[in-house]
Amino acid sequence: MTLKGRLPRSTNATFLVEVGLNGATALAVYKPERGERPLWDFPPGLFRRELAAYHLSEALGWGLVPLTVQREGPYGEGSLQEFVHADFTQHYFTLCEDPAHRDRLARICAFDLIANNADRKSGHCLLGPDGRIWAIDNGLCFNVDPKLRTVIWDFAGEPLPEAIRDDLRRLVKSGLRPTLSALLEERERATLLSRAKRLAQTGRFPTEGGGERYPWPAV
């Protein structure tokens, strides 16, 4: 793992790195635990929540979060996430204007609801070179207390697509995979499944809750 530089405008220490295997190289985003700013409402080890978000996305079959693994790097243990070569002029507030992205954004919305994402800024939705939208910066998820802060309220009050309901039901019925369970506390696991069950049963995106439901800054 070779450090290429520190990413600007990140609350926690976040680095662009180059990783290699068998002669092949790729860029990745490295978030070491040592670089995390202490929070009163989240325990240390936010990088594990980045990992958990990836495994939840995979368990649902949605593929929203770039490949994320746990690695020992120059600044210690942390998460290593595949770098998205995105069009950084695009973010949620621009992407939501294109009907072609609606299904993908609806899944990100549902994902944030059950993961209890406390920080879904517009800039955390990236448009990849293949036209696929990715959800990044998922470290403030899975709190047992209501923490939802998101800019994605365009679906408020709308029926939940049946495909999303089916995936949520499947998750609840099968339970969490060991790779995901190992990253969360018992109450966090139970709350995650409870939120998924409630959303599937309700069958509708919740209505907007007011100003406190938005992260700051929004982009």
Identify the meaning behind each predicted range.
Residues 6, 20, 43, 128-219:
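C-terminal catalytic region of ATP-dependent kinase domains
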Residues 1-101, 105-118, 122-123, 129-138:
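Conserved ATP-binding subdomain of kinase catalytic cores across diverse folds
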